[in-house]
């Protein structure tokens, strides 16, 4: 083992640290301080000349340092380094590395202005650029270029949208690939077309995003007219710029609203009223849109006539003469409205037009909906909105057919009842001598009648006019099976009370008892 005294042979000759007795550990740990503690009882001079320490302090040894007595220094440190220099040597590179990482992290975060993402689906944007192309077909590179040109959001460093474009082209069945070379199906540079009939209507609508929820009015609500009718779509700068003057933004929103109003009538894929009327006009209603335009009245007049009846559709059985072209006779259908009954009043706007022109339009036809039978007297009543207008010939009422279903206001018996009113009452026991007292032709509890004596002596009940023939009655009018089953399975529920008192009252009667009927 090495002599500990040899460890201190590194002090220069004449040094105050040179001593026969080895210094204590406290002296070794604080050798670089200005005032050394009195370890050996000697007084040290305060003007200490600092010499380079040949080994690091012992505190590093306690912290896990690898100190070698042979080398007299720590591994990785020069022999002439002291505690302060050792600390700076280790912490200096760490601080420089942390600073470099912070600067690199700041350099990666680019401070650029990012445009708002368009609130449309990728399917709608792809179909839009393909339909706006002259040949209605584009390559993948052309689609990417047109989309980035039309929507500035895709001009930034974000490249994930290109994968979304490729995914929608390959997964959606509305896009079809046209091979540039049929012999090389796996080659690149093929064309893509779109089948507009397979595009979902919801995919062309404005999507629910944070931009649209914030009240942005710069984007059109529906791309269907631009995709289906090949309208030219031009991106709006106000949709992406954040520093737009309020006056310019207001003018752009007004222009877009007017554009939507003008294109709404030509759109036949939306459920707008103008679109539906346009479809009806193309079929067989040339005057439908004109009549509805005349019905658009002011709000004040609409409040006074808010309970006026809605127009009904009539199908004309005779050719009528068109008011615009007197020499041309066409067969068409028009709209008309009614006041109290089905068709005795026209709308206010249409009435004013007739009063100005002095013409009366003849409407002869049968309404699709059957009128009420008990509204005969209501046709003579006048409404304040009718004026002096009265049709030349009111529409004829449809006769009640036997195949029509009964309604709450039908004044005839439906054909599927058990017994029609033209025959005698249906009775379950034809051999019983039972006479009906009431005038009702039915044998159900709501129609049970009771005798009302007219004199003190009383009259005998009147008998049936003809014998009951159940077979012929059911052969002439087949009963409703469900009702017939109920009547035959529970006959006691529908037996007249007077029958029970007449025929089943006595105990010696040959007829079955009441318990047999129940």
From Swiss-Prot:
Residues 104-113 have a biased composition (Basic residues). It is found in: Nucleus. Residues 329-346 have a biased composition (Low complexity). A motif (Fast/FoxH1 motif 2 (FM2)) lies at residues 415-421. Residues 72-113, 318-397 are annotated as: Disordered. It comes from the Eukaryota. A motif (Fast/FoxH1 motif 1 (FM1)) lies at residues 405-409. Pfam families: Forkhead. The keyword Transcription regulation applies. Transmembrane segments: none annotated. A motif (SMAD interaction motif (SIM)) lies at residues 470-491. One of its GO terms (cellular component) is activin responsive factor complex. ARF1 contains 2 smad2s, 1 smad4 and 1 foxh1/fast-1 protein. Interaction with smad4 is most likely indirect through interaction with the MH2 domain of smad2. Binds to the MH2 domain of smad3, which can incorporate into the ARF1 complex. The ARF1 and ARF2 complexes are activated by distinct TGF-beta family members; formation of ARF1 is promoted by activin. Interacts (via Fork-head domain) with gtf2ird1/wbscr11 (via repeats 4-5). Transcriptional activator. Recognizes and binds to the DNA sequence 5'-TGT[GT][GT]ATT-3'. Upon TGF-beta induction, forms a transcriptionally active complex with smad2 and smad4 called activin-responsive factor 1 (ARF1), which binds a site on the mix-B/mix.2 promoter called the activin response element (ARE). Binds to activated smads and the ARE with much lower affinity than fast3. Necessary for the first steps in mesoderm specification, directly inducing mesodermal genes. Acts with fast3 to control the convergent extension movements of gastrulation. This is Forkhead box protein H1. It comes from Xenopus laevis. The lineage of its organism: Eukaryota, Metazoa, Chordata, Craniata, Vertebrata. The gene is foxh1.
């Amino acid at each position: 083992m090495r002599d500990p005294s040899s460890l201190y042979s590194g002090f220069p000759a004449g040094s105050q640290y040179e001593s026969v007795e080895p210094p204590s550990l406290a002296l070794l740990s604080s050798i670089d301080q200005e005032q050394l503690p009195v370890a050996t009882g000697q007084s040290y001079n305060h003007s200490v000349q600092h010499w380079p320490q040949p080994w690091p302090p012992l505190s590093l040894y306690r912290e896990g340092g690898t100190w070698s007595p042979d080398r007299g220094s720590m591994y990785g440190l020069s022999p002439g380094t002291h505690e302060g220099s050792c600390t700076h040597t280790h912490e200096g590179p760490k601080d420089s590395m942390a600073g470099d990482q912070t600067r690199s992290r700041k350099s990666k975060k680019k401070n650029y202005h990012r445009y708002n993402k368009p609130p449309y689906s990728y399917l709608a944007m792809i179909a839009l650029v393909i339909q706006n192309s002259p040949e209605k077909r584009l390559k993948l590179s052309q689609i990417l270029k047109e989309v980035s040109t039309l929507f500035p959001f895709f001009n930034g460093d974000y490249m994930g949208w290109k994968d979304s474009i490729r995914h929608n082209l390959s997964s959606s069945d509305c896009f079809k690939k046209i091979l540039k070379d049929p012999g090389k199906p796996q080659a690149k540079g093929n064309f893509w077309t779109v089948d507009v009939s397979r595009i979902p209507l919801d995919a062309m609508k404005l999507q629910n995003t944070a931009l649209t929820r914030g009240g942005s009015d710069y984007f059109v609500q529906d791309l269907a007219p631009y995709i289906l009718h090949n309208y030219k779509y031009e991106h709006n700068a106000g949709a992406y710029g954040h520093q737009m003057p309020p006056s310019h933004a207001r003018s752009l929103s007004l222009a877009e609203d007017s554009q939507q109003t003008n294109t709404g009538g030509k759109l036949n894929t939306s459920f707008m009223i103008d679109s539906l009327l346009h479809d009806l006009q193309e079929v067989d209603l040339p005057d439908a849109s004109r009549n509805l335009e005349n019905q658009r009245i002011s709000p004040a007049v609409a409040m006074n006539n808010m309970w006026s009846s809605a127009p009904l559709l009539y199908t004309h059985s005779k050719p009528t003469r068109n008011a615009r072209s007197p020499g041309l006779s066409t067969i068409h259908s028009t709209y008309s409205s009614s006041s109290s009954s089905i068709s005795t009043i026209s709308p206010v706007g249409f009435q004013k037009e007739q009063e100005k022109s002095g013409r009366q339009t003849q409407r002869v036809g049968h309404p699709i909906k059957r009128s009420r039978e008990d509204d005969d007297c209501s046709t003579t009543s006048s409404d304040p909105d009718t004026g002096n207008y009265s049709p030349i010939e009111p529409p004829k009422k449809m006769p009640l057919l036997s195949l029509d279903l009964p309604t709450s206001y039908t004044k005839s018996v439906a054909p599927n009842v058990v017994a029609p009113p033209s025959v005698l009452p249906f009775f379950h026991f034809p051999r019983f001598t039972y006479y009906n007292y009431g005038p009702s032709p039915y044998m159900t509890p709501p129609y049970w009648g009771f005798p009302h004596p007219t004199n003190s002596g009383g009259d005998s009940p009147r008998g049936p006019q003809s014998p009951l023939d159940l077979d012929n009655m059911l052969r002439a009018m087949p009963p409703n099976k469900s009702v017939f089953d109920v009547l035959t399975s529970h006959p006691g529920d529908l037996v007249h009370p007077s029958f029970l008192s007449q025929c089943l009252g006595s105990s010696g009667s040959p007829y079955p008892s009441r318990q047999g009927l129940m």
